[in-house]
């Protein structure tokens, strides 16, 4: 096996490859893809990381329990929806303030395009309705100039509502 410099770079600097993928976002469609992918990644890392930490070595066995898997699926959609809301607001706030992108109504359009796609992919109806309600509530009061500089999770958690 022959290693060249490119292979070595991919192995040693994977973050460069990950971040360079999004460095050249030039269209609203690319923003949509970014929001969808990042929300999925955050929710997956958050939920499965939490479960693995809490259950320890038994986490593998728990994935054989159908009731447990059903509960994980419900939780997955709720965490994803919360991530989707935060990521959408963060991205459009950043674009508004830092890139002079004034079409903040696109946030609403993109959010519901993604949410409706996920509903067609089997999103839990309760998670869908809850996300719709929370997004609309926050959308009407968001300060586009400052949101991206605030702590992301300043709103009450789902269990507080």
Regions found by a protein language model. Give the residues of each.
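N-terminal entry module detector
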Residues: 1-3, 91
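Leu/Val/Ala/Ile-rich N-terminal alpha-helices, chiefly Sec-type signal peptides and the beginnings
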Residues: 4-58
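Alpha-solenoid helical-repeat scaffolds
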Residues: 18, 33, 37, 74-81, ...
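N-terminal interaction modules that seed assembly of large macromolecular complexes
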Residues: 53-98
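Long amphipathic alpha-helical segments
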Residues: 83-152
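A very general structural signal that marks isolated residues within well-ordered alpha-helical segments
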Residues: 93, 160-161
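Conserved small/polar residues in nucleotide/adenosyl-binding loops
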Residues: 153-160
């Amino acid at each position: 096996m022959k290693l060249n410099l490119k292979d070595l770079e991919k192995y040693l600097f994977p973050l460069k490859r990950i971040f360079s993928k999004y460095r050249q976002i030039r269209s609203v469609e690319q923003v949509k893809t970014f929001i969808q992918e990042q929300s999925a990644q955050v929710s997956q890392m958050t939920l499965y990381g939490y479960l693995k930490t809490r259950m320890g070595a038994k986490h593998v066995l728990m994935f054989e329990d159908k009731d447990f898997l059903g509960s994980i699926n419900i939780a997955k959609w709720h965490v994803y929806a919360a991530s989707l809301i935060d990521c959408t607001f963060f991205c459009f706030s950043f674009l508004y303030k830092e890139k002079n992108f004034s079409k903040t109504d696109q946030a609403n359009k993109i959010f519901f395009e993604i949410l409706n796609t996920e509903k067609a992919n089997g999103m839990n109806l309760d998670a869908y309705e809850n996300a719709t309600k929370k997004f609309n509530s926050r959308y009407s009061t968001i300060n586009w100039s400052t949101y991206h500089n605030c702590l992301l999770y300043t709103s009450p958690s789902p269990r507080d509502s």
